Amino acid sequence: MVVLAADRLTVRQNGKTILNQISFNIKQGEQWAITGPSGSGKTTFLKALTGKQFFSGHLTIKDNNLFPKKVVLIEQQHYFKNLSNTSNFYYQQRFNSQDAEDAVTVEEYLQYVISKNVKANNELAWLAELFDLKKLYPERLIQLSNGENKRLQIVKALLEQPAFLLLDNPFTGLDVKSRQTLEEVLYTVAQKGIHIIMVTSAAQLPFFITNVLSLSDNGSCSVAEVKAASRHEVNLKAGTISSLNKDLLHELTVNGKRDFFKFAVRMKNVTVKYDHTILDNITWEVRSGERWSLSGPNGSGKSTLLSLVNADNPQAYANDIYLFGRKRGTGESIWDIKKKTGFVSPELHLYFKKSTNGFDVAASGLFDTIGLFRKINEQQKLLVTKWMQLLKIEHLTKRFLFQLSNSEQRLVLLARALVKNPPLLILDEPCQGLDDEQTAFFKAIINEICVAGNKTLIYVSHYPAEIPECVTKFIKLENGKRIE
């Protein structure tokens, strides 16, 4: 029995065809994955199914009285409001315990959700147990890890009792164990009769997926059962250095100003506590020119460790930490430190105004601000333009951040991190949202920058294949402790 049918579904944006006459049928009991390269319209496709995106053609969803709501979409990023009912969070707020108190707790958030739906109250208990949320009830939303936040948003969606649960890259940013756990609980959800449609990569197809709809750059699609779909292993080792403009890269990096320091980072017996211990007695040295991989499961303390290095965490002053040869708290400002670092994180774009355009996001890296709040001169404009050309994103200069796909947002933020040619690059999941080709290209750039420009690198990824070949040092965290 067909439960969802699409006939010649077409989406056009700004004169460009994103989806071109897509037709398919979803039958009772089927679970679908949507794959395709960056920019092929995967997120647009999900929004069309929910009615959030205008389309031509026909979409028919069979009514089912067991499910009060037809379709619910969980987007890749979620925007929370604080207790003041605004969204004016700032990036460092999660590391400032007093300011973080303006964010609601997990329990308060869920109570608000069920207050609008009496029937949902009966569902909360088993969902909270299934998704292991009860232990998170006292936690502030702004302090949740990627995996914790993803579980919370899925529970919220399921409390609406949808017939179709749509997920946009649900495994992005999750470690191996968290991905396996989420896959298992989604299978349990599917067994309840809910149909799952998720955007993911062909290399991350969950075991319960029955059909794959693959989108292409020209807006067309192909449909296959999983037994005929390719569950390929991603190989990103080769890179795409042949397509890299080496002359421009050397102009922007090798010929720039050199900073001299023996150690970028020196910390001894560092401990960070809030309600509980986040980092426990960490000792770590990063010498000039070293390239490090920082790994560990979700919630192991990686983001907190990076916040100490990037001058975002005030607990640095209570610990024995030296950055670029100076002890924290001896007179240097956070801006003195940030001048020497280029930083990317999975959630950084959430703190920019959506109306900021791609050029201004990249240019803000010159001043380490979340937005461009001053005029820049012609030389600076040329510099930003060249970096965007190098990353092949010059076509995004005038487009607003909210108009960009997740992968395009990520590339603009990479330009922001690189634009001032800093001696230390701190890249936290920089390839999140990029397709295989973009990831290989970015790895090639990082390798070339670090080797030719003698850069110091701290690189975080849950995927070993995403780590650049120039990385030779490794640190691993687990439960706040260094285990490697």
Write out the residue ranges for each language-model feature.
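Catalytic Walker B motif of ABC-type/P-loop ATPase nucleotide-binding domains
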Residues: 165-169, 425-429
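Conserved beta-strand-loop-alpha-helix hinge in the C-terminal portion
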Residues: 208, 215-248, 469, 473-484
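Hydrophobic anchor residue at the start of the ABC signature
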Residues: 154, 414
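Conserved ABC ATPase "signature" region
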Residues: 119-136, 363, 378-396
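The feature captures the beta-strand-to-loop junction immediately N-terminal to the Walker
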Residues: 35-37, 295-297
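Conserved ABC ATPase signature
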Residues: 140-144, 148, 373-376, 400-404, ...
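ABC ATPase nucleotide-binding domain signature region
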Residues: 46-115, 306-370
